C-alpha cells in the first residue's frame, strides 16, 4: 500500500475497539528511504491512541529503533533523544506532545524479569508503549495490542506489516 493510502487503512485497523473482523486483517506497506520512514511514523503517531501497546518485531538491524524515532519525532521528541534501550531496557520520552515508553526485551531472560520493570504502569501511562522483541515476553502483553513487523529489504528500504492482536479471554475452570 502506498503511504497516501495508508492513513485510512491504519486508522480503521488500530483505532477504537477491537472487533472480530480485525482478526485476520493485515495492513502492509513498503518504504524506500529514511524520509518515507519518517512519513510513516507521522501517520502511525496520528492514528494510535494513548494507552496503545505496540509490539515491534524484526531481525537485528531491521529498523525497530529507527521506526520508534520516526513516531517519537512526529510527537515532538527530538530524534537524537531516541536511542535503543537494549542495555537500559526502557527509555522514557516525555518532551513531546505525549509520553512514549520504549522497551527492549532482547536481553531479558524471562517474563519475570520483564514484569519486574513494572510494565503495567507504562501500559496505563497515558502514552504509547513500544516493545522491541515483544515476542520474547508475549504472555506479558495486554490482551489487546498492535503488532508491527519490520523486514529490511534494502539499505534504507523496509517492509512493514501492521496487525491488531486481541487474545481471547479464557474461561475460569
What are these regions (language model features)?
Residues 59:
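P-loop (Walker A) phosphate-binding loop of NTP-binding proteins
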Residues 78-92:
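Short beta-strand-centered segment that lines the nucleotide-binding/catalytic pocket of NTP-utilizing
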Amino acid at each position: 500500500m502506498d503511504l497516501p493510502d495508508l492513513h485510512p487503512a491504519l486508522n480503521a485497523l488500530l483505532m477504537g475497539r477491537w472487533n472480530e473482523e480485525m482478526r485476520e486483517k493485515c495492513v502492509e506497506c513498503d518504504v524506500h528511504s529514511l524520509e518515507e520512514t519518517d512519513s510513516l511514523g507521522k501517520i502511525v503517531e496520528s492514528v494510535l491512541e494513548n494507552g496503545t501497546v505496540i509490539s515491534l518485531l524484526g531481525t537485528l538491524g531491521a529498523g525497530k529503533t529507527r521506526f520508534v524515532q520516526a513516531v517519537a519525532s512526529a510527537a515532538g521528541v527530538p530524534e537524537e533523544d531516541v536511542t535503543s534501550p537494549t542495555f537500559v531496557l526502557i527509555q522514557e520520552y516525555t518532551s513531546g506532545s505525549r509520553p512514549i515508553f520504549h522497551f527492549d526485551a532482547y536481553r531479558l531472560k524471562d517474563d519475570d524479569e520483564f514484569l519486574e520493570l513494572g510494565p503495567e504502569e507504562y501500559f496505563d501511562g497515558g502514552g504509547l508503549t513500544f516493545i522491541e522483541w515483544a515476542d520474547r515476553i508475549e504472555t506479558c502483553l495486554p490482551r489487546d495490542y498492535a503488532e508491527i513487523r519490520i523486514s529490511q529489504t534494502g539499505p534504507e528500504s523496509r517492509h512493514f506489516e501492521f496487525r491488531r492482536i486481541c487474545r481471547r479471554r479464557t474461561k475460569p475452570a
